[in-house]
Regions:
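Acidic (Asp/Glu)-rich catalytic clusters
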Residues: 145-153
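Short glycine-enriched loops at secondary-structure junctions
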Residues: 112-113, 138-145
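Low-acidity, Ser/Thr- and Arg-rich intrinsically disordered low-complexity segments
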Residues: 1-24
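Conserved, mostly hydrophobic/aromatic
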Residues: 50, 107, 128, 186
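Active-site mouth loops of central-metabolism enzymes
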Residues: 106-118, 158-166
Length: 233
C-alpha cells in the first residue's frame, strides 16, 4: 500500500511538474507582461491612437447594438474538453476556396488599417502567414495590392467594394489576380456609409475635409498623441 501511495505521489508530482513546464512554455510566448490578451492590446491602442482613429476601429454604427450582440454571440462559443480519449495528433488544417489553411479561420478585411499604423496591412499579412492562415485585404486598406503581396509570401485574398463602378472593379480584380491573390470576397453589406456617432463627435468629417479652420477644433486629438504623429512623418 505504501509503495502504491508512493508511486501515486510521484505520478501526481510529475503531472504537476509537467503542467507547470507547459504553462511556462505558454507564458514565454507572451512578449510583454503588459500585453497578455486582446483587452490589453485594446487599451494600448486607446493610449497610442488619436481619439478619432481609435473610435473608428473600436466603434460601430449608431448605438452599436449589432456590434454588442456580435460580441455576445462569440462569448457564447466555448470549448468542450474531452478526457480519457485517444488523441494521437491534433490537426486543425482545412482547405477553403482552394486555399490550404493551418487554422479554420482567416484574418478578416479591415478598412483604413494604414491610419492605425503606416504598414499595418503588410504586418497583418505577415502575421497571418506565420500563423498558417490567409490575410484578406480590404478595398480601403490604404496599401497597394502589389505592396502587400511583396510584403508576404503567404496566401492572400481580396475584399472588393464596387464604389467606382464596373470598370474600376474589373481593373482592381485584374491587379489582384496578377499579384497572386487566391480568392475574391465581394462585400455588398454597405450600400451607404453607416451613421457612426463616435466619428461625428470626434469631428471625423471636419478633419477629412482638409480645411484647416474647419478641422482646427478637433486637431488636439493628434497633438496629444505625438508617437502616432511621428509614425507618419
Amino acid at each position: 500500500a505504501r509503495r502504491a501511495r508512493s508511486c501515486s505521489s510521484r505520478a501526481s508530482i510529475g503531472s504537476i511538474s509537467s503542467a507547470m513546464r507547459s504553462e511556462s512554455a505558454l507564458a514565454r510566448q507572451v512578449r510583454s507582461p503588459r500585453v497578455v490578451n486582446i483587452a490589453d492590446l485594446r487599451e494600448r491602442a486607446r493610449r497610442r491612437l488619436p481619439g478619432v482613429v481609435f473610435d473608428y476601429i473600436d466603434g460601430a454604427a449608431e448605438d452599436e447594438v449589432t456590434e454588442s450582440r456580435n460580441r455576445g454571440a462569440f462569448s457564447e462559443v466555448t470549448f468542450r474538453p474531452r478526457q480519457c480519449v485517444p488523441v494521437p495528433a491534433c490537426d486543425l488544417k482545412t482547405t477553403l476556396l482552394g486555399t490550404e489553411l493551418a487554422l479554420p479561420f482567416l484574418l478578416a478585411p479591415v478598412g483604413n488599417i494604414r491610419s492605425f499604423y503606416p504598414m499595418g496591412d503588410a504586418h497583418a499579412a505577415r502575421a497571418a502567414h506565420a500563423a498558417g492562415t490567409a490575410f484578406i485585404q480590404s478595398t480601403f486598406s490604404g496599401m497597394r495590392i502589389e505592396d502587400v503581396r511583396a510584403a508576404s509570401a503567404g496566401p492572400l485574398w481580396y475584399q472588393l467594394y464596387v464604389p467606382g463602378g464596373r470598370a474600376v472593379a474589373e481593373a482592381t480584380i485584374a491587379r489582384a489576380r496578377a499579384a497572386g491573390y487566391a480568392a475574391l470576397m465581394v462585400t455588398i453589406d454597405t450600400p451607404v456609409a453607416g451613421l457612426r456617432e463616435r466619428d461625428i463627435r470626434r469631428g471625423a468629417r471636419q478633419i477629412l475635409s482638409g480645411q484647416f479652420l474647419t478641422s482646427l477644433p478637433y486637431l488636439w486629438q493628434f497633438v496629444v498623441r505625438p508617437r502616432w504623429v511621428l509614425d507618419f512623418l
